[in-house]
Amino acid sequence: MELLIQLTSLLLIVIAGPLVIALLFLKQGNL
């Protein structure tokens, strides 16, 4: 069960990471 939680958290980090960076770049570009 812990392995599944670790995999899902890792997947969230892998997906959310680039999204947050893209949002930051968009905000800087709009300014």
From Swiss-Prot:
Q: Which domain of life is it from?
A: Eukaryota
Offer a single GO CC term for the protein: photosystem II
Give membrane topology per the record.
Answer: Single-pass membrane protein
Q: What is its main location?
A: plastid
Keyword Transmembrane helix on entry: yes
Give the record's family classification: Belongs to the Psb30/Ycf12 family.
Quote the protein name from its UniProt record: Photosystem II reaction center protein Psb30
Q: Which organism is it from?
A: Phacus acuminatus
Upper taxonomic lineage: Eukaryota, Discoba, Euglenozoa, Euglenida, Spirocuta
